[in-house]
A protein has these predicted regions:
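Short, low-hydrophobicity acidic/polar segments
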Residues: 73-184
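Acidic/polar, low-complexity intrinsically disordered N-terminal segments immediately downstream
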Residues: 23-120, 125, 286-338
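Bacterial N-terminal signal peptides that target proteins for export
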Residues: 1-9
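Tryptophan-paired
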Residues: 60-115, 202-287, 338
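Acidic, serine/threonine- and glycine-rich low-complexity intrinsically disordered segments
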Residues: 135-246
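Short, hydrophobic/proline-enriched secondary-structure or compact coil segments at domain edges
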Residues: 36-42, 191, 259-266, 322
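C-terminal motif of bacterial Sec signal peptides marking the signal peptidase cleavage site
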Residues: 17-20
Length: 338
């Protein structure tokens, strides 16, 4: 059976079209090109739902060669664009390779009047390494060398992942590759209440509150590095609706194997609450929420802690009963004390 020349030419044209990665059909994204981006999710919270779009206003990505751990690229995005549906950081121009990627989110915040809360290491592409990447909480260093913080903190988030960026030498990896980066929140709001057992109104000016922990320096993997102890002071104090008083703190990451120590002192110098571990107290109610979590997962998910202490007629807390996030807690031992 003979074939006409025109039939053969038509067959060749069709084959060429199929080999062109559907560029005729998908003119905006030829499938013979590999493209890559990074998307983000923050569902590591007590809602167990993604709240990235409403909570994060800046992201900084560091891409390290997986073998040498040398920094190969940095990407930064900030502003209202992060609230867009399916926001992603485009990796166009990133060299092909296998990468360990670290994300710090919330460091850059130009939209409000708060000073910067955190500073990232000064990193140089081509020479800096993964182990040099740190995030440091800003603090006041006083003349005696002690470190203090009484500021509200911008919400800080951290995440890590691994990814491969494909180049022209991987024709079987064409198309779009999107990597999802899960975030954990590193900042916490702590609300401390003192409630009068006698019904007599307490004076907000009569109490001094501190939380002490050396947790202001975070490594690339979100672990705590050795740091000076930071004395946190409330950014706000006031009265409660009843006869009590309250103080609000922002503190950096809480760790299950460490203690952040709360002390409340009255005007006479008497310790109302003396060196109590709020970390241990917070974990007393972990199992009340109906989710299976280990201690560190709970501390990473729960970013808001309320501790209510009843002050007796002698002006101190008994050390036996308190409320944690509205749950009544009866203490059977002194394990919460450092």
């Amino acid at each position: 059976m003979a074939y006409k020349f025109s039939d053969i030419l038509l067959s060749l044209c069709l084959a060429a079209t199929l080999a062109s990665c559907d560029s005729v059909i998908y003119e905006d994204l030829p499938l013979c090109v590999a493209t890559h981006d990074v998307r983000f999710v923050w569902d590591h919270n007590m809602d167990f739902s993604d709240r990235f779009a409403e909570s994060v206003r800046s992201v900084t990505l560091y891409g390290f060669d997986r073998d040498t751990q040398v920094l190969r690229w940095i990407r930064t995005e900030k502003g209202e664009a992060l609230a867009a549906d399916r926001f992603a950081v485009d990796l166009e121009g990133v060299p092909a390779g296998e990468y360990s990627v670290v994300a710090w989110c919330g460091v850059e915040n130009d939209s409000d009047d708060l000073p910067d809360s955190f500073t990232l290491s000064d990193m140089t592409v081509g020479s800096s390494t993964l182990y040099q990447l740190q995030c440091r909480m800003e603090r006041e260093v006083r003349e005696d060398g002690s470190h203090h913080s009484s500021s509200r903190l911008h919400d800080l988030f951290h995440g890590v992942t691994s990814m491969t960026v494909y180049g022209d030498d991987n024709p079987d990896k064409t198309g779009h590759h999107s990597y999802l980066l899960d975030l954990k929140k590193d900042t916490n709001r702590v609300h401390v209440e003192l409630r009068s057992e006698t019904g007599e109104a307490l004076d907000p000016a009569a109490y001094t509150y501190t939380i002490t922990e050396a947790n202001g320096l975070l490594h690339h993997d979100n672990s705590l590095l050795d740091d000076e102890p930071i004395t946190y002071h409330p950014f706000a104090v006031g009265e409660t609706r009843a006869t009590g008083v309250a103080a609000d703190f922002d503190v950096c990451r809480l760790m299950a194997d460490r203690h952040a120590a709360l002390t409340v002192t009255d005007a006479s110098g008497r310790k109302v609450v003396d060196n109590v571990s709020i970390t241990s107290l917070a974990l007393k109610v972990k199992d009340n929420y109906g989710h299976a979590m280990d201690d560190q997962e709970y501390l990473d998910r729960q970013d808001s802690h309320t501790f209510s202490f009843d002050v007796s007629s002698d002006g101190t807390w008994s050390g036996a009963v308190l409320y944690v996030n509205s749950w009544r807690v009866v203490l059977m031992s002194d394990v919460i004390f450092e």
